[in-house]
Each structure stands twice: as structure tokens, then as C-alpha cells.
Amino acid sequence: MGSKGAERRKQATPGQTPEGNVVMSFSFESYQLEEEDCQGKDISDKGVLALSEPAFEEAVPDDRYHGIYFAMLLAGVGFLLPYNSFITDVDYLHHKFEGTSIVFDMGLTYILVALVAVILNNVLVEMLSLHTRITVGYLFALGPLLFVTIFDVWLERFTIKQAYVINLMSMGTVAFGCTVQQSSFYGYMGMLPKRYTQGVMTGESTAGVIISLSRIFTKLLIKDERKNTIIFFVISICMVLVCFILHLLVRRTRFVQYYTSLARRGLSHAKDHSQHASQYQVHHDVITEEGNGAVGCSPAGDGCADFAGGNTYVRFDVPKPKMKRSWPGVKDMILHRYVVARVIWTYMLSIAVTYFITLCLFPGLESEIKNATLGEWLPILIMAIFNISDFVGKILAAVPYEWNGTRLLFFSCVRVVFIPLFIMCVYPAQMPMFSHPAWPCIFSLFMGITNGYFGSVPMIHAAGKVAPEQRELAGNIMTVSYMSGLMLGSVVAYAAYSFTASGSSFHSQTGYNFTQGY
């Protein structure tokens, strides 16, 4: 733990102005008075005192044992785990709601509500505090999980039609809460070093892997479907609670408070912060002062006091009063977002295009890939390969490489090649061009890696392209782009699903694990 800068009054240090006037500086916050070189300057120049940010004699906090990084990884797990919990018990859903498209309807409900939530969160970013939004998000995510587990799965209080509607409503509530968390966390991570954004995004992929393993083991160990589903949901609830408690603990750590306070004061991260640290200085300017040549000072604005005694001026420095932040007007909010979007627009398009292409294919079109030998296991295998490779891609995003925004957008668009490749794995229905099961597995592997990588890199780098005080807003704007890509991809996938489902009875007779890797 670093020691704070001494806040005792330093011994007065005199400074000489070009006209021979003496300036005495008494500092209460480790400020220094420096004399600026005045050689070669016109003798008529006046001395002006300038105030900039204080230099804090505080050691940069360290993420000892990578505990903060691990907590942020679990944060990514926490805000996608409730959604994955509803989707991953696909066997229970298909058995209970036989002959319906419950999994697909829940996925579409999630995307549509999530888009509304991320836009609303973007509007409220200046109105509600960061941690208020995250806490509310956790409560909205946990509530439906508890309600469905107790009243629908355990007590079975509803009819089939009622349960269907309640599950969709629960998914919508989860979507709202989880998306508010997600959008807020991206803004939160924008204030921390880049690796923590990568940690959160890796956690998103980890959520799909963890919840899939949880469902596999509960189903293998407990044969009764209702009991293993209850235990599955209880495990999910406990994991979300752990993530929530970790968030409450981590937000109070010195590491997080140090970096978030830097960002809110408009300073860079620690290594840049040391370069910007400055003191009171005597600057020479051509601005005309009072007739007696006094050094100008604004007592009300700078919290200083001048005492004229001959040609001697004494300045006492006191901390600036904190100003209460008022809510901005609509025009200001639009202007703030426009200014940020002008800087990061290539990153916004990159992440939107990446997830649009992925959602066009996953899980909709991939679930239609059939094979006589592997049967219904092929789509499950393809989904598993995608989730694992997506996880690997997000880990690779941690490798330091400075991407140019235009190149990043180009490579994100190149991924469109996966669309015709997967179509050739499905059509023509009687004999697809890529009929061997290895082909869709290979395509899914590369699609997952590129989705994880190009879905993470724009989010990681975008916050570093704007001023520190704009980083939380940049993270929220990037999440709007991210969710826009998901929504547009889901709409296209829904059209493809309706088209293929009408001509195939195979899909209606089997249930697949549509665990989302995004």
C-alpha cells in the first residue's frame, strides 16, 4: 500500500518575477513554486501564476497475485451466466415445451430486450452511478433465476402455457439486468488498464464453457430430469452470487479506486500520470495586469489569498472545492456521444460486423447441419467447438498488438466468407457440397477463434483512443454497437431458421444445445 503525499505546509519558497516582485508560496498539498527561465524575454512581460493538477506522491497500486484480473474475469462470467443457464438446459425445455421453438424464442427475446437495455444504459450513464447500475443489473438477473427455479421447476405451479410465457418474461428480465451489467462493466473496464477489458470478455466465453460442463455433469450424475435441473439452477445462482460479492469487494480496493479516480479527473493511467504531474509555476505572458504590476490571482476560482505588502505577494494554496455534478441536457448528451463516436467509429463498426456475421450462423444455421453417422451429436459437437475456440480467441486478444482501426474493420469484414462456407454444409439438402462432418467442425473452429479475437480487440482498444474522462462513455457506446450487431444477426438468422425449418423435419424432432458463446 502506497503512502499518501504529505499534506503539511511546506516552508515558504520565494519566486522572483521579471519586475523584481516577490511571490511567496505556501503549499498544503505538496505543490512547488518554480521559477521559469526569463532570459531573452521582454522586460515588460508580466508574471502570471498558473495552476495545474497536483502531483500525488502516491505509489502506483499493484494487482498482487492477479486477484483483480481474476475478479474481472468472473465479472464476465457473472453477467452472461444467467442467460446461459436458461438456454443450456435445452433438454429440459424441449421435453417440457415439446414441439415449440422455446430455445430460439428465448434467444431472440434476450437479444431484443438487451438492445433496449444497452441504449437505456447509455442514456443513464451520466445520471446514475456506475456501481448503482451494476448492482441493479445483478438483482434483475438473480430474481428470475430464483423465481423460475422455485416456482416453475421445483413447485411446478404453472400450466404449460403459463410456464412458457413466464420463461420468456424471465428471459427478458434477465436480458435487461445482464445487459445493464455488461454495458456498465465495459465502461468500468475502460478506466482500468487494457488487460482487464480482455479479462471481462474472456469471462463471457468462460460462462458458456462452465455452464455447459455444469449441465453435462448434473445430467450424468442425477438421472431424474427435474432434480438435476433444480441442482443445475442452484449451482448457477450460487456462482452469480459469488460474482456479485466479488464485485462489491473489488470496487473498494485501492487498485480500482486509484484508476477510476484518475479517469474521472481526466488523467491517464499511472505511467502517463507521472508525466502530467505539475506544480505552480511563474509564466511570462503579455497580458496586461493592474497598473501596479501585481501578479494576478483569482481567489474565488483558485481558492487562494493574496496579501499585498510592498512588492511581496503571498499565496496560500487550499484544495479546490468539489463541484456537484448536474445532469446534462439532451443536446450535451448527444454532443458527448458524437465526439466519442467520431474517434472510435471504426472500432464500433468492427465489433458490430463481427457479431453480425457470427449470429447469422450461430446457433441457427449450424443447428441445421446433419450427418447420417453422427446424427444429432454433430450440431452439439459443432457448438462445443465454437464455444471452446471462442474462449481461445479471447485469450489470444490479450497478446499485445496495436491494431489500426481501418485494418481491424477490414479483417472483421473478411469473416463474411464463413456464411457461404456454412451454407455449402447445408445445401443442397440431399447432398451438401461439404458433406463430410469434418468440414463444419473446421469452419466452426476458425469462426470461433476469429469471433473471440475480433470481438474482443475493438472493445479493448477503443477506450484507449479517447480522453480518460470519456472512457466509460466509450465503453457504453461500444456495447451499443456490439448489441446492434447481435440484433441484426439474429433477425437474419430468424429468417434463415424459418426457411430451413419448414423444409426439414429433422430439426423439429431433435433438440440441440444452443449455448451462446457471445
UniProtKB/Swiss-Prot annotation:
Residues 1-10 have a biased composition (Basic and acidic residues). Its main location: membrane. SUPFAM superfamilies: MFS general substrate transporter (SSF103473). It comes from the Eukaryota. The keyword Metal-binding does not apply. It is a multi-pass membrane protein. GO terms for cellular component: plasma membrane. Residues 1-21 are annotated as: Disordered. Residues 1-66, 121-133, 179-198, 251-342, 398-407, 461-476 are extracellular. Belongs to the SLC29A/ENT transporter (TC 2.A.57) family. This is Equilibrative nucleoside transporter 4. The gene is slc29a4.
